[in-house]
């Protein structure tokens, strides 16, 4: 597994990189990879998305191939794009989604935050609102897209959309929940440290001991 911390990058550049890595993973020419990054401000619209859920068009909106509806990405939000071959791991996309939720729930617990799933909705939630959005796509059973967790970002841009198609969806950030400054590098470190072990626990590869 390769970890690549990209810093703050444009959405289009990150998507192009995902495509190249996913193709390499499919051909067994590239190791599975976790990209961690932040985006410049952008709205993304998933396959189930409706442009009417964007209430303000001052920020670029891009329609993409992940599942889900509309969400916002910007600095201070940790985005993770795992490029994982699910074929030797059982081709179980729903279980993969639950793995991503468990990863983030376990990470924020390190900061004293109690997060949880909501039945029938993909993502990570807290008593104060939704903390992380999750939307994935697959090509030849190689995953693309991933998760976006609010760490220390300005949440006002979420007020100009119906996030994930939910008109009254409150949005939380790790920093607001903790009531103190949270360093992005610390969150990245905890995500990176847990990712491989939890992936192998939830989705063990065929033949793995």
Swiss-Prot record:
Q: Could you confirm whether the keyword Transferase appears in this record?
A: yes
Ordered alphabetically, the record's keywords are:
Acyltransferase, Cytoplasm, Transferase
| Pfam families named in the record | LplA-B_cat
The protein's annotated pathway: Protein modification; protein lipoylation via endogenous pathway; protein N(6)-(lipoyl)lysine from octanoyl-[acyl-carrier-protein]: step 1/2
Q: Name one GO biological process term.
A: protein modification process
What sort of enzyme, by top EC class, is this? transferase
The protein's annotated catalytic reaction(s) are: octanoyl-[ACP] + L-lysyl-[protein] = N(6)-octanoyl-L-lysyl-[protein] + holo-[ACP] + H(+)
What is the top-level taxon of the source organism?
A: Bacteria
Detail which positions bind substrate.
66-73, 133-135, 146-148
The protein's Enzyme Commission number: 2.3.1.181
Which cell locations does it reside in?
Cytoplasm
Q: Which CDD domains match?
A: LipB
Q: Which GO terms describe its molecular function?
A: lipoyl(octanoyl) transferase activity
The record places the active site at 164 (acyl-thioester intermediate)
**What GO CC annotations are associated with the protein?**
cytoplasm
> Per the database record, which ranges form the BPL/LPL catalytic domain?
28-203
**What does the function comment of this entry state?**
Catalyzes the transfer of endogenously produced octanoic acid from octanoyl-acyl-carrier-protein onto the lipoyl domains of lipoate-dependent enzymes. Lipoyl-ACP can also act as a substrate although octanoyl-ACP is likely to be the physiological substrate.
Family the entry assigns: Belongs to the LipB family.
**What is the protein name for this chain?**
Octanoyltransferase
């Amino acid at each position: 597994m390769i970890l690549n911390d990209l810093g703050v990058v444009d959405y289009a550049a990150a998507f192009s990189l995902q495509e190249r890595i996913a193709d390499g993973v499919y051909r067994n020419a590239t190791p599975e990879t976790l990209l961690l990054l932040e985006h410049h401000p952008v709205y993304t619209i998933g396959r189930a998305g409706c442009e009417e859920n964007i209430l303000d068009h001052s920020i670029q909106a891009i329609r993409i191939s992940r599942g889900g509806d509309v969400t916002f990405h910007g600095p201070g939000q940790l985005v993770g794009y795992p490029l994982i071959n699910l074929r030797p791991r059982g081709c179980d996309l729903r279980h993969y989604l639950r793995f991503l939720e468990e990863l983030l729930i376990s990470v924020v617990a390190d900061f004293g935050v109690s997060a949880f799933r909501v039945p029938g909705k993909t993502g990570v939630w807290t008593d104060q609102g939704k903390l992380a959005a999750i939307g994935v796509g697959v090509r030849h059973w190689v995953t693309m897209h991933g998760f976006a967790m609010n760490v220390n970002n300005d949440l006002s841009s979420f007020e100009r959309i119906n996030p994930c198609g939910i008109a009254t969806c409150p949005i939380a950030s790790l920093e607001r929940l903790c009531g103190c400054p949270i360093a992005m590098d610390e969150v990245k470190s905890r995500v990176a440290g847990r990712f491989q072990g939890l992936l192998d626990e939830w989705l063990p590869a065929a033949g793995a001991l």
